[in-house]
Amino acid sequence: MAPAQAAQPAPAAPAAQAEGLSALVNPFVGTSSEGNAYPGATAPFGMVQLSPDNANSYGNTSYSPDNRWVWGFSHRHINSAGCPAAGEILVEPSAADSPITAREQIAMVDGSEAAHAGYYTVQLEGGVTAELTTTERVGVHRYEFADSDTGHLSLNVGETLRDAGSSEVAWVDDQTLEGFVENGGFCGGTSTTEKVFFSAHFDRPADSTGTWDGSGTYTEESPSSVSDGGQNGAVATFDTTTDQDVEIAVGISFVDVDGARANRTSETSDDTLTFAQARAAAEAGWDDQLGAATITASNDARIIFYTQLYKALLSPTIGSDVDGRYRGMDKAVHTAEGWTYHQTFSLWDTYRTQATLHALVARDHATDIVRSMYQQRVEGGWFPRWSLGSIETNIMAGDPASAWVAENFTMGTVPDDIADPMWDYLVENATTPTPGDVASVGRQSADFYNQNHHIPFYFENEPGLGQEYEEYRHGGSSSMEFAISDAAIGAAAQRSGRPEAAEFLERGQWWRTLWNPDVELSGDYQGIVNAVFPDGSFNVRSNEKDDVTKSGFHEGTQWQYQWMASQDYAGLQEVMGGTDEFLDRLDYYFDMPALLENPGQSPSHWAKGGSDYYSSIGYNPGNEPTIMNPWLYSSAGHPAYVNDVLASNLNRFPNTPGGGVGNDDLGTMASWYVMATLGFEPVVPGSGMMALNSPRVEAASLRLGPDADSPVLQINASGSHESMPRYIESVAVNGTDHSATWFDVEDILSGGTLDFTLTQDRDTPWGTSRADRLPSVSDPVQVKASATAGSPEFQSGVETTNVVGKVEFEELTKIADDAVTFPTVSATFTADGTEYEAQPEATDNGWEFSVTAEFAKAGNLSGTLSVSAGEDTPKFAPETFEPVSVEVPVKVLGADPTDDPSEPGTDPSDNPSDGGSGEPGTGPSTSAPDPSESGGTVGAGDAGGSGNADGSGGDAGLPNTGAKVAGIVAAALLLTAAGTVLVARRRKQN
């Protein structure tokens, strides 16, 4: 990935030619600076990506705006990945005397390219104008031959953006050509291939047809051609003297020619669909899909936003034919009944952002995508790591499938009928070595990892496992990835009530095995993550800028990877020496002084671009392991700093060919941009924790479903700015003031509101208290709770407030800066058939609970104080402590001293519902009525135990120390500052 560069805005189709949101999309964004985007036409998640080809390097995988020529227009492309792939069935137009029979450069007319969502056009040499659009499974072309009497259309199946294998073309008649090409390979990860079948139909009969073979020799009237590899193709020639336009519809399939033909005829109404109709339908489809998000912003901001949203909705791509058949990961043909199979999963990238965005704005596709992943596990024998069509490439490292699946469980996009087996597959995937007979490598080191809590690191340039397996030569980064995937599983398990929660939340802390406290770093810091050798020793042969061959960290330095523990903020702060040291190191990493001096600009200290992996120890804004780094500040009480970083980062997405920060990686960075622009980001997969930041739009609404009546998330951001930092003064979630720096995604999945008030004041106190910090998913506060009964006394007929008991926390957990905090708490007190909500007041080591109550009759009662963790405990965490309760003796005094149930000689028949009393205690009453009003003295001390209804059998009074009930610890997360008081309210028990 390379840096964004200043350039003129990329061309787009004139507004008069297209209306709606599709017209705002600029597909040329990301086509330079190693962005590797394709500018052609496609439908949302479309099987066909019909686009010009003029490059196939790692810097420009299919298209470069600097090359003012094309080879032609092929039907399948990968959205902004790091390596060339696909490029099958290349259509090459020509107005020359002879047709093109190999991949040749066809000159473009400068300034003639234009595109928007669903449409692309360019003028070529010889007076040829090419126009492209698509349905989901069909590429639709229109070629105008304005300056010639003859037009040739060559379909080249022997050359692709990779090394094509066998291929075949056959003329069915003078309007229809069918065949296939075998293609494959991606980033050096695999040599496996797959077949792409096609069925092409011209809008009129060709005047002549023919084929060419491996020699490149064209043979007119040849009905077919077969190749074992190399050149191969067919030509259709038309008389364009009077009718200058030729249209062609090309259906593709991964199953067979019959599937390609059925896709074509079904989606073109039996070949009657015109290019104009297809284009209008494509634009309407994009208008609807993009319409899931509406924003109030400037036109420039809307162009950038909808361009990025468009990129987020390109993949995974549809893989099943109109009849539901698809090619599975086992290479066999299967059928999706009642749903649509999707394929090509760039999981190492997309688990971080795209799965979440799809669940919000493309939920119907999201559930089908999840079901597709399930089928890939069933048919392929294991979850994929990085699948391209039906090919497992096994590129990248870690265990991204686990995090991706966990996030979908949390987002509610796992269909109920597959939820249980999919969960079982998920746990197996994370704990078991991959079987030897499956293509996916999974967690090869699972046994070692389960025992030692890290992946053994082997140098890739030395004998050993590192030369053979990516997981081992990337032992450092893969260990970090495993930990966050395990935390994601644990969080999703907790949310869904599954028993694996505690185990996997604890495994989320295993990244700490990599922390070497003795390494001295730039900036006078000490301690960093190191890859760990099989014997448990650190890889100290690596310095902080070494590349992966020396460090074991893939696509990033150890400085950058140290922050990839967002599931364990507390642990990260602890190993760095406390919150202050953590913040100081963050400031150095982001170069905060430069950000403050030049707001909205990227400091020179940052990595120069996404693929500038190893030359900088500073922030890399364009590569996946670091994209959640800005929100680290919210875990340490400084949420304003998040917006300083984001203002600079989001400005790296201009409306230019270099817009973005390198590879979008199949929608990952685009999804990140969309959500950050709206004011939130899913910083820990599986948790449902959406970290907040200042939106860059004035208002937005998200349609959380496919229909017009679907629930809506409304976002309002008073005081927003589109390029400069703004800070959160206040937030309301669903109408309730919200001081925490995050919200739970479940709060908005059924619709809701996020109301921001923004300010230019960087010193706004919002989100700075300890209770408001981003919580650690994998490092919960652990406390033991014990409840002690009080000695409350009430006067009959008078509303009185008394202390009914207290809860003390033993072994209080201290955060890195040694400030002691308490869990949130919920408490009820039940007596005489009525339940009261007890009001907590913080003490030195817990809470004291008071109840305001009124009892009608004097007597001794037995009450129960029940205390549990507060309702605002995060859904991804167990309760802070197990619920505790204690029986509380309650004395209700009468208006007359003779009504005092504790006085000797009191007639129990005066209060037949209460038993006799025990001996009174001596502790003072917390609150007592004025004796002058009651006509008697106030009793004191602990009340005795209640007797039976007949007046006999009263318990002896409890000792002054009170009764205690111990609670055993459960993992928890959310902390709150001492002194919080809950409002008491009274409710009748049913």
What are these regions (language model features)?
Residues 13-355, 359-403, 409-468, 472-480, ...:
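Accessory carbohydrate-recognition regions in carbohydrate-active enzymes
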Residues 228-232, 843-850:
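Aromatic sugar-binding surface patches on proteins
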Residues 791-802:
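Short, solvent-exposed loop/linker segments at the N-terminal edge
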Residues 891-959:
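C-terminal low-complexity, Ser/Thr- and acidic/Pro-rich disordered "stalk" regions positioned immediately N-terminal
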Residues 2-15:
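Sec-dependent signal peptide cleavage junction
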Residues 853-857:
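Residue-level recognition of secondary-structure-to-loop junctions
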Residues 816-819, 872-883:
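Beta-sandwich strand segments
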Residues 960-986:
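A cross-kingdom C-terminal cell-surface attachment/processing module
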